[in-house]
Amino acid sequence: MLRATAPCWFPPGYPEAKKVAEEAALEAPEFPLPSHQPAQSFGLPVPQMHNQASAFVDIQAEPQNRGPAVHPAWPKMVTEACYFPAQRGSACCLPAAPRLTERPSGVRISAPRKRKTIAQSSSPCLVTGCTDAKRTRVASSSQRSSGSKVGRQPGKTRNRSGMACKTTTTISSKRIVRRPSLPSLKKPIILRRSGCQVPTVLRRGYLQLFTEECLKFCASKQEAEEKALNEEKVAYDCSPNKNRYLNVVLNTLKRLKGLTPSSMPGLSRAALYSRLQEFLLSQDQLKENGYPFPHPERPGGAVLFTGQGKGPGDSSCRVCCRCGTEYLVSSSGRCVRDQLCYYHWGRVRSSQVAGGRVSQYTCCAAAPGSVGCQVAKQHVRDGRKDSLDGFVETFKKELSRDAYPGIYALDCEMCYTTHGLELTRVTVVDADMRVVYDTFVKPDNEIVDYNTRFSGVTEADVAKTSITLPQVQAILLSFFSAQTILIGHSLESDLLALKLIHSTVLDTAVLFPHYLGFPYKRSLRNLAADYLGQIIQDSQDGHNSSEDANACLQLVMWKVRQRAQIQPRHRSASPAALACPWPQAPSTTAISPESSPCPPRRKAKETGAVDGRRGQKAKSNPNRPLPVPRNPCRGPSGLSPSLCPSQTSVLPLIASRSTEPPLPVPRVPAAPPRACPHPSAHPRPLSLHH
């Protein structure tokens, strides 16, 4: 039978506890032993140990927050039974823990390669952290020694050998956590629609690139982030798949970086204006393409020189410009009967297939003559060529010597009203691709179809504007003069919507003609894709007038650069070359360049190599025309006169050819010199290397 020898084995208030305590006090040493706790448990649970002191000490352990409370009388383990003697022996040599003068405000536990911060606690006990290797119990104890109250003291942690372990306890001041500011925590939100194949990681990468480029020209970081987010959203909305998204974002990034120059590098505005004059439309081209001209008799009127198709005989009958159906209208222009309009918004395109060519609509791939794939509430008409009143004409302006008339790109958007197409938006871009004027316009008549698929104008855009067509005309007349170059694609439709008469225009539809010729025209979208590598007019929200105007301007700049590359460069000739452009050998039979365009190289051969094979062959056929070079401006060395060497450097070469020993052939008397025939009948000349 085991005998209880420690007071802690009995429950609080048990009678035997006092008796055991008295027996233990007699066997205890004369000096008190401090409390000791092993530092490391080597993976095994080790309970708290308390050495016996001279006075009775009652220690109660507080239960942990996690898990149930531990019963004080749990049975001993093998490790505990073997570990007690060793701990008692080492505890006798340990000094007492120092007393703290003030209450610790924070505790930080430092471990090898790891630091962990302990939270503040309002409890009077010391708060320690729990690691993966061991658990430290939180305990509070009170001890009275020599009639004074002893404060709670944290004990030093030691290992088995009596040395301090690597885990130390440091008491520091109150730690202030630095938190980032609110603007840095705000991140752009990328919205994602269902069914899209563009990864979000790819979108974030290009959004970051857009932001970096926008920071170079935006006033603030917030403005740059908003602009970059809008650019990425536009590219994402018009991209059904990943490949299309990559094409759009690359074009957008190229535009933001400014890789596509807005004007010719190193070329002034006046020089650019002079270069664009060769691409202007002539009077015949203006009439052929339907540009308005001032009416000779009626002020404010316009006249068109294109053949107009004959409409229905009844003045109240109109023809729908979308489906081709005839419908009746009232005096106000409204439809008499409510009829649905079934139409195809795409064009008819012919493609090559096995066995021939097939014509299909680009919108739904249906055959011509099929029922339309789109439905509108009523029929509409164009009507711009029916009302030719209210036109204004640009006038000449006096400019200073350093000024030039100006170069602008123009694009307009229109909606269907009761009287046909009317202006709802106008955008003007200068030669630097900067938007100088952009506004929505309120039509004079009631809108029946906003045509948002192509115009990009909505009901909300028109509702918030009060600008009318006469106000727009006044502003444009202040910008333009009669000499100002206006650039656009099918610009006659824009001028008819603006009711503006201007003849100094550059039309990209004429500058880049269709391979079938007039009246076929290539679309601006195809031209931008073929020549600029850009995808435009691909948004579901409709066209953007500023985007179309910039595309027209870039196409014209591309044409100017191409013309500058293929144009021959005129090099200035040296004085020696101008004095003697064609060096010749002295000969009595040679014909001077002034009397004949024949090359002196051939005449030099005849004088110096008369006995040669070639000289003999030429003399045997006196009716054969003498060869001349392709370009009469070229000299004997095959170069232009400005690049020919001097006469002294060419004469030794001719002399060396003339001193070669002739072949043994019979001599033939030389033919008398004759006049050189027309240069067009001359064959290709022989080279000196032959």
Swiss-Prot record:
Its main location: cytoplasm. Residues 631-646 have a biased composition (Low complexity). The keyword Nucleus applies. Residues 612-626 are annotated as: GOR14-1 epitope. The keyword Nucleus applies. Residues 605-614 have a biased composition (Basic and acidic residues). Residues 136-162, 567-690 are annotated as: Disordered. SUPFAM superfamilies: Ribonuclease H-like. GO terms for biological process: rRNA 3'-end processing. One of its GO terms (cellular component) is cytoplasm. Residues 585-595 have a biased composition (Polar residues). Belongs to the REXO1/REXO3 family. This is Exonuclease GOR. The lineage of its organism: Eukaryota, Metazoa, Chordata, Craniata, Vertebrata. The gene is REXO1L1.
